[in-house]
From Swiss-Prot:
<keyword id="KW-0149">Chlorophyll biosynthesis</keyword>
<dbReference type="GO" id="GO:0015979">
    <property type="term" value="P:photosynthesis"/>
</dbReference>
<comment type="function">
    <text>Component of the dark-operative protochlorophyllide reductase (DPOR) that uses Mg-ATP and reduced ferredoxin to reduce ring D of protochlorophyllide (Pchlide) to form chlorophyllide a (Chlide). This reaction is light-independent. The L component serves as a unique electron donor to the NB-component of the complex, and binds Mg-ATP.</text>
</comment>
<comment type="similarity">
    <text>Belongs to the NifH/BchL/ChlL family.</text>
</comment>
<keyword id="KW-0602">Photosynthesis</keyword>
<keyword id="KW-0067">ATP-binding</keyword>
<keyword id="KW-0460">Magnesium</keyword>
<protein>
    <recommendedName>
        <fullName>Light-independent protochlorophyllide reductase iron-sulfur ATP-binding protein</fullName>
        <ecNumber>1.3.7.7</ecNumber>
    </recommendedName>
</protein>
<comment type="pathway">
    <text>Porphyrin-containing compound metabolism; bacteriochlorophyll biosynthesis (light-independent).</text>
</comment>
<dbReference type="GO" id="GO:0016491">
    <property type="term" value="F:oxidoreductase activity"/>
</dbReference>
<dbReference type="GO" id="GO:0005524">
    <property type="term" value="F:ATP binding"/>
</dbReference>
<feature type="binding site">
    <location>
        <begin position="53"/>
        <end position="58"/>
    </location>
    <ligand>
        <name>ATP</name>
    </ligand>
</feature>
<comment type="subunit">
    <text>Homodimer. Protochlorophyllide reductase is composed of three subunits; BchL, BchN and BchB.</text>
</comment>
<dbReference type="GO" id="GO:0036070">
    <property type="term" value="P:light-independent bacteriochlorophyll biosynthetic process"/>
</dbReference>
<dbReference type="InterPro" id="IPR000392">
    <property type="entry name" value="NifH/frxC"/>
</dbReference>
<dbReference type="InterPro" id="IPR027417">
    <property type="entry name" value="P-loop_NTPase"/>
</dbReference>
<dbReference type="GO" id="GO:0046872">
    <property type="term" value="F:metal ion binding"/>
</dbReference>
Length: 87
């Protein structure tokens, strides 16, 4: 999703804002905010798998970092031998 106009359209649809080079996350970054009315209780488990090279580790790492910044406790386990999610 490198097309900036596509990112802008997606951001408008989900109520976020897109960034160009003005955001710290880089060009094409999509910023969303957690709805304060939504209460997350209990553990949530997400499994991501599929074809190689499509951004699974990148997406998982970015989601983990975002939830952590929101004050959520996050445990990310990566079984990829390439260790792409290693920080």
């Amino acid at each position: 999703m490198n097309d900036i106009s596509t990112v802008n359209k997606l951001a408008e649809r989900i109520g976020g804002s897109s960034c160009s080079t003005s955001c710290g996350d880089g060009e094409g970054s999509l910023q969303v905010a957690l709805d304060p009315h939504i209460k997350i209780t209990g553990a949530k488990v997400f499994a991501v798998y599929g074809k190689g090279g499509i951004g699974k580790s990148t997406t998982s790492s970015n989601l983990s970092a975002a939830f952590s910044r929101l004050g959520k406790r996050v445990l990310q386990i990566c079984r990829d031998r390439g260790a792409d999610a290693t920080i």
